[in-house]
Amino acid sequence: MYQIYVIFKCFPGKREAFVKRVKEEGIAELVRKENGCIRYDYYFSEKDEKELLLIEEWESKKHQQVHIEQPHMAQLRSFKGDYIETTILGEFEIK
């Protein structure tokens, strides 16, 4: 199993709008239907109104690498910069 933790620092007042847009454009639903996707969920920080956590869980790193090349991920990248100031990525494999 392969997991990714993404910590987004959103522009002020943009955190909820980003998640709403991801959902409204059907991106989260499309990701969850991808081959090998076990989990794709966003979480809000209680301490920092600009912080957003994304947890992705995949059957393998190969599945996740195919995922990032999907058209809906290009769509997400096209508007991400309007909402997200910085991104920190952590990853690990469970064997």
Residue ranges: model-predicted function:
Residues 22, 67-68, 77-80:
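Short, flexible helix/strand-to-coil boundary loops that buttress conserved ligand/catalytic motifs
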Residues 38-50, 75-95:
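Glycine-rich beta-strand-turn "strand-cap" elements at beta-sheet edges
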